Amino acid sequence: MEISKKAATLLPKPFYVLSQALNLSNKDHTKWWYSTAPMFATMMAGAGYDVHAQYKFLCIHREVIIPALGPYPEKGQPMHWKSHLTRFGLPFELSFNYSKSLLRFAFEPLGSLTGTKDDPFNTQAIRPVLQDLKAMVPGLDLEWFDHFTKALVVSEEEARTLLDRDIEIPVFKTQNKLAADLEPSGDIVLKTYIYPRIKSIATGTPKERLMFDAIKAADKFGKVATPLAILEEFIAERAPTLLGHFLSCDLVKPSESRIKVYCMERQLDLASIEGIWTLNGRRNDPETLDGLDALRELWQLLPVTEGLCPLPNCFYEPGTSPQEQLPFIINFTLSPKSALPEPQIYFPAFGQNDKTIAEGLATFFESRGWGGLAKSYPADLASYYPDVDLQTANHLQAWISFSYKGKKPYMSVYLHTFEAFSAAAQEVAMCHDGHNP
């Protein structure tokens, strides 16, 4: 059956071809495909990815990622598992680096036992997915994954103890997730993110201490001892508003991997963010100060409710568009090449007006002379969700990351990735099933 010309002009050819060629017999897999693949395909095509890379990444998405996303969320039905990845508990998210025209995705692998008494904190689903990816990603190395998982993820014995003692567990239970940088040429770099919250509750050890001790144990030759010591000192200075949150590392051999410590900052004002950017004055080189000027400019363009921000303690239902102010997230890269930890600032966009944010980003991108998808950002965002009014929506953009490298801003936008292009995708799905659109 032919697809209408209208739908055919909306979505890239690789999406259509694979929708016809891939096995879409599983109901949940099919729904995840038509919910996430159209936006995935559109962003790759718009960024000029090699067509072979587009097919490769979409095939990996269908064959490895989608089977690990669990049951598809249905309105009015309780979700199988709510992931800390998004405010809706959805386990998949796309992001785009507008400085490098680089697409990324992140997901929390879910399994059939996730959330049951046999795997109450979803610690078991991630390894089978990594084994599948190992066959597809040359250079994938699990040494640091194994190390940090053992140090920061709750063990089976600890999980049983938590349940047996009926200890109160927070709503955010995610232990780990995976992310991938997708190069336009077809190469992939995988990363893992590990959350020590439940381990901290089980052991009585603060999250920061768990992460710092795990890093010291991994850093056998003390290559990042200096920036780590400064980070420990800095976080202590910023207490109680700067809180340790989670840790990430690249899944490559340890000598080439980066370690990042993520924190939440509750004190939302420009002076607070300036202090984080300069590490309370420790970073004062010309590039840092140039980056500070750009950061101040971005601050003026994005909506922030200033003051002491409460920590989130709930998920929202998909299909809603709530208003809220989230804390900032900061990551600090620990590198042997720098004596100081290098901060990256994440502006919370979720809960703020999407049109205001999109226009602010467009102004900032234009002032930098960025082309490609940066040039068409507001129009592209609106096109992903044609049935959503940006003037009243607060949920299409989740985070905006900012750092400064090579004398220019380095920025990514993390986007709501659920039922984009819904009308066009539904038409393709109906044609695949043999129904008239």
Curated annotation (Swiss-Prot):
Its EC number is 2.5.1.-. One of its GO terms (molecular function) is transferase activity, transferring alkyl or aryl (other than methyl) groups. Keywords: Alkaloid metabolism, Transferase. Signal peptide: none annotated. It catalyses: cyclo-acetoacetyl-L-tryptophan + dimethylallyl diphosphate = beta-cyclopiazonate + diphosphate. Disruption phenotype: Impairs the production of cyclopiazonic acid and of its biosynthetic intermediate beta-cyclopiazonic acid, but accumulates the intermediate cyclo-acetoacetyl-L-tryptophan. Substrate binds at residues 104, 191, 193, 258, 260, 262, 344, 346, 410, 414. L-tryptophan binds at residues 84-85, 93, 195. InterPro entries: Aro_prenylTrfase, Aro_prenylTrfase_DMATS, DMATS-type_fun. It comes from the Eukaryota. Pathway: Secondary metabolite biosynthesis. It holds the Pfam family Trp_DMAT. One of its GO terms (biological process) is alkaloid metabolic process. Cyclo-acetoacetyl-L-tryptophan dimethylallyltransferase; part of the gene cluster that mediates the biosynthesis of the fungal neurotoxin cyclopiazonic acid (CPA), a nanomolar inhibitor of Ca(2+)-ATPase with a unique pentacyclic indole tetramic acid scaffold. Belongs to the tryptophan dimethylallyltransferase family. This is Cyclo-acetoacetyl-L-tryptophan dimethylallyltransferase cpaD. The lineage of its organism: Eukaryota, Fungi, Dikarya, Ascomycota, Pezizomycotina. The gene is cpaD.
